[in-house]
UniProtKB/Swiss-Prot annotation:
<keyword id="KW-0131">Cell cycle</keyword>
<dbReference type="GO" id="GO:0003924">
    <property type="term" value="F:GTPase activity"/>
</dbReference>
<feature type="modified residue" description="Phosphothreonine">
    <location>
        <position position="216"/>
    </location>
</feature>
<dbReference type="GO" id="GO:0005200">
    <property type="term" value="F:structural constituent of cytoskeleton"/>
</dbReference>
<dbReference type="GO" id="GO:0032160">
    <property type="term" value="C:septin filament array"/>
</dbReference>
<feature type="binding site">
    <location>
        <position position="236"/>
    </location>
    <ligand>
        <name>GTP</name>
    </ligand>
</feature>
<dbReference type="GO" id="GO:0001400">
    <property type="term" value="C:mating projection base"/>
</dbReference>
<dbReference type="GO" id="GO:0010458">
    <property type="term" value="P:exit from mitosis"/>
</dbReference>
<feature type="binding site">
    <location>
        <position position="251"/>
    </location>
    <ligand>
        <name>GTP</name>
    </ligand>
</feature>
<dbReference type="GO" id="GO:1990317">
    <property type="term" value="C:Gin4 complex"/>
</dbReference>
<comment type="similarity">
    <text>Belongs to the TRAFAC class TrmE-Era-EngA-EngB-Septin-like GTPase superfamily. Septin GTPase family.</text>
</comment>
<feature type="region of interest" description="G1 motif">
    <location>
        <begin position="39"/>
        <end position="46"/>
    </location>
</feature>
<comment type="function">
    <text>Septins are GTPases involved in cytokinesis that assemble early in the cell cycle as a patch at the incipient bud site and form a ring approximate 15 minutes before bud emergence, which transforms into an hour-glass shaped collar of cortical filaments that spans both sides of the mother-bud neck. This collar persists until just before cytokinesis, when it splits into two rings that occupy opposite sides of the neck. The septins at the bud neck serve as a structural scaffold that recruits different components involved in diverse processes at specific stages during the cell cycle.</text>
</comment>
<dbReference type="GO" id="GO:0005876">
    <property type="term" value="C:spindle microtubule"/>
</dbReference>
<feature type="binding site">
    <location>
        <begin position="180"/>
        <end position="188"/>
    </location>
    <ligand>
        <name>GTP</name>
    </ligand>
</feature>
<feature type="domain" description="Septin-type G">
    <location>
        <begin position="29"/>
        <end position="302"/>
    </location>
</feature>
<dbReference type="GO" id="GO:0005619">
    <property type="term" value="C:ascospore wall"/>
</dbReference>
Amino acid sequence: MDPLSSVQPASYVGFDTITNQIEHRLLKKGFQFNIMVVGQSGLGKSTLINTLFASHLIDSATGDDISALPVTKTTEMKISTHTLVEDRVRLNINVIDTPGFGDFIDNSKAWEPIVKYIKEQHSQYLRKELTAQRERFITDTRVHAILYFLQPNGKELSRLDVEALKRLTEIANVIPVIGKSDTLTLDERTEFRELIQNEFEKYNFKIYPYDSEELTDEELELNRSVRSIIPFAVVGSENEIEINGETFRGRKTRWSAINVEDINQCDFVYLREFLIRTHLQDLIETTSYIHYEGFRARQLIALKENANSRSSAHMSSNAIQR
């Protein structure tokens, strides 16, 4: 019999319920998602996260209040942990903020604490995997996505952005966004996006999403459409305002009102659709299969080489003693 042939059972067996069994287990366990925000203060990082998940997950500094900045002149890691429930689906979310990034006169190597943190999470996961009696479900603290905030200044990438993106895109799924994009006109926004896309190509950054041979034509087309929008021009708001009898999430300015859910005013809806509704699971899987696997392979090779070196040294020592 052809091993690939399809056979219809003569009567009902019941293995079609496996999807229900998987769903039940996943609903019971919940999903883990770890998202990091990187960018200078005053770009609306906290507000955007809270707007994306329609929940107050992290506090934000008011404006550019210097007192809200870290005392030490280094990038810090501030982690907020929450559980969100929507229609029986439980999402365990860690939001990793990086206060201090790019906020000082000397920002050289501001990315190093971020890179160190990401690698440490991979290392912790690997250690738990290699223990003799490992946990059935290893707590996953690996960073699944990084929202990287760019200044809405219409200029080329800064040296800090270039150096940070070069390193972060090698070890994590980076999604660039233009913070507080309502400070730009629509034409300025379009020109700025094209400029930044050219910069990404110039520096050969591996911006998420990635294509692979496993993707269908429909999925490849979706990725192409997403890449045409990156960096997302975003505006966030936790407040509801009313204009002409219509209530929406947004904020009022001196001249007009910004509706964050209006695709003609910003890309918030597109970012939410991409990040949460179409690519959330892929972000988690890509972190595991690409970024973590690469780290794991390098670590295991290094361990093997160290073991071989010690073995060779031991054999040489015995030979000398003889």
